[in-house]
Amino acid sequence: MNEQSEPITMWFDRRLVLRKSPIQGIGTFATHEIAAGELLILVTGGIVYTTEDWQTGKVQLEAELYNEANIAKDLCIATPKSFHYYVNHSCDPNAVDLSRSGRATQYVADRAIRTGEEITADYYDETTLKQCNCQSPKCRWVK
């Protein structure tokens, strides 16, 4: 591992649970009402490695267990999959990721969230999002 690896800190609002999602696979859901502006998820740090580390086998991570992101040219960070990984996309989201770098994930409620509602964020990108299943009347994929 790279000397730039950082301690992993994960914090999740206790009113969140993982459940089967009608949008895709597993989703993060609210068990109680959550007010706009409340912090939902905060993840910092991770296993930092270079693409060379990966290619030469110095780093071996099980893809099913880790969420990976590029943080610079030829530099990646991995964190264990948890609530942050299961925030599904919606064209009409109720949460926003305030992170400004790949070294942190910080989801905040963008509006009031009802009990039982799935936590969603808009990470629309034509190059990575091949299909949208958000089922929102505001869906940008519906023609």
Question: Language-model features: where?
Answer:
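Catalytic cores of histone-lysine modification enzymes
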Residues: N2-V96
